[in-house]
Amino acid sequence: MYSVSIIGASGYTGAQLVQLVLQHPKLELAGTYVSENSNDANKSIAELHGNLAHVNATLTPISDTALSEMANGVDFIFLATPHEASHDWMPILSSGKAKVLDLSGAFRIKDTAVFEQFYGFPHTQTQSLAQAVYGLAEWHEAQIASADVIAVPGCYPTASLSALKPLAHNGLLDESVRPVINAVSGVSGAGRKASLTTSFFEVSLQAYGVLGHRHTPEIEAYLGTPVIFTPHLGNFKRGILATVTVKVKAGTTSAQLEKAYTDAYADKPIVRLRKSFPKIDDVAHTPFVDLHWKLDEASGYAVVTAAIDNVMKGAASQAIQCLNIMTKQPIETGLVL
């Protein structure tokens, strides 16, 4: 058994991690933590998340001393914390035997100037940044297997890259035309903190972060080409539906697209290649990525749709996939019945 601590267990992603760790046959939950100034410090996790009413776990406030002890006291640490906290704590947490899986955006972007532009604070943890491996589980398995620090991808990048990487990997994209990604996320993507934008009476379908969302440089860095990315807030709880329009190279056929996706995901049990365009209900509360595509050979434009649960594959279950890779278990262990 591998011991696991979760920092930031009060939020949606942290609570989902608690549930996944508890149901995993090879993991034991060593502790659940929040920051010292959290309003949820010393509360029961059952008090915050009714689906965990059966779980006897307290949200312990974490100190710098406790961080250092944790680094040598458990096998794995999940960070479901704000970007700034992950940035500041990583050198301590990664200094011991524990392997760290960070679900914030603090270590996804290697270019520190780009990071500061999109995240609003300077990145000074250069050693940890160099150490971090991007945890897109289906595409970076070899690097993940030997990593000590994992930067778990963002929710929108997970959906977008899952849709686009088979085309890029096979050289099928017309690089003179940027892929256009329109993606809609449920309000859980904004976290538990109350805000007018995500309140019941105010939430509606709306674009946000237009031509400036912080997931744009993340997608571009791991796709290898610029994109036009427009996220939308939807009036539902969970899930992301990303619809991607791309121009493929002249002469590309539907058979080539079929082969690209089949070859990429034939042995990837978390990715489901669908016969029709997926919907969010197909993936809500599951770890799956559902994909479908259609090509107009006359114009050279293809539309690819990816559906994921933003809290699962977009965060917590992908972190578990990475842990499974790191411990040489089947990637779907603890995730798929």
UniProtKB/Swiss-Prot annotation:
Ranges in coiled-coil conformation: none
Localization annotation: Cytoplasm
Enzyme superclass (EC): oxidoreductase
Chief place where the protein resides: cytoplasm
Catalytic activity: N-acetyl-L-glutamate 5-semialdehyde + phosphate + NADP(+) = N-acetyl-L-glutamyl 5-phosphate + NADPH + H(+)
Entry-linked PROSITE patterns: ARGC
Gene Ontology annotations for the cellular component aspect, listed alphabetically: cytoplasm
Pathways involved: Amino-acid biosynthesis; L-arginine biosynthesis; N(2)-acetyl-L-ornithine from L-glutamate: step 3/4
Active site residues per record: C155
SMART domains in the record: Semialdhyde_dh (SM00859)
Listed NCBIfam families: argC
PANTHER family: N-ACETYL-GAMMA-GLUTAMYL-PHOSPHATE REDUCTASE, CHLOROPLASTIC-RELATED, N-ACETYL-GAMMA-GLUTAMYL-PHOSPHATE REDUCTASE, CHLOROPLASTIC-RELATED-RELATED
Protein name, UniProt field: N-acetyl-gamma-glutamyl-phosphate reductase
Upper taxonomic lineage: Bacteria, Pseudomonadati, Pseudomonadota, Gammaproteobacteria, Alteromonadales
